Amino acid sequence: MEYKTPFIAKKLGVSPKAVVRIAQQLNLTIEKNKYGHFIFTQEDVDQMLEHHRFQIEQSQNSQSTQKASSNEVEELKTQVNTIVQNISSNDFEQLANQLNTITRRLDRMEEQMQDKANDVVTYQLLQHRREMEEMLERIQKLEAALTKEEPIYITPDSKPTYEREKKPKRRKMIFSIFGL
């Protein structure tokens, strides 16, 4: 008997693409009918069912090993907690003191970095101010040189240029037709 991909997919509980993938993994010879549909034999279906059941069993076994590993993690956590509780209070105080000294050093270093950043910014501002003053001096010197060299006489026009230009008068249409 011949079976098509959708029937096998329903039987296995997977998608039709998964059926084709399983057939390729098992190196089954897959035939196609004249419409391009895959056709499987009863032997192919049996092999795919066995393979699928085997994969399901493996996934269940891996889940049980994951549960066992999570139990081991919980045991390790309890061991760490007991070790931490067994540490003497003297050791705890020493660790707290070391932590305090480290935080103080970090605070001092942050303040020093902030001071250096402020110094750099003020230096840059002073440099920019000095450059601006030099530019102002140059501009003033150029203005003085221009006033000495070339006296500029600007006479305001009584009318703007667009009003001064006279537009040619248009002749009347009748005159232009007769050439007058």
UniProtKB/Swiss-Prot annotation:
Residues 67-151 form a coiled coil. SUPFAM superfamilies: Influenza hemagglutinin (stalk). One of its GO terms (molecular function) is double-stranded DNA binding. It is found in: Cytoplasm. GO terms for cellular component: cytoplasm. Residues 5-25 bind DNA. Gene3D superfamilies: 1.10.1660.10. Keywords: Cell cycle, Cell division, Chromosome partition, Coiled coil, Cytoplasm, DNA-binding, Sporulation. It comes from the Bacteria. GO terms for biological process: asymmetric cell division; chromosome condensation; chromosome segregation; sporulation resulting in formation of a cellular spore. InterPro entries: Chrosome_anchoring_RacA (IPR023522). Transmembrane segments: none annotated. HAMAP family: RacA (MF_01170). NCBIfam families: PRK13182.1-1. Required for the formation of axial filaments and for anchoring the origin regions at the cell poles in sporulating cells, thus ensuring proper chromosome segregation in the prespore. Binds in a dispersed manner throughout the chromosome but preferentially to sites clustered in the origin portion of the chromosome, causing condensation of the chromosome and its remodeling into an elongated, anchored structure. Belongs to the RacA family. This is Chromosome-anchoring protein RacA. The gene is racA.
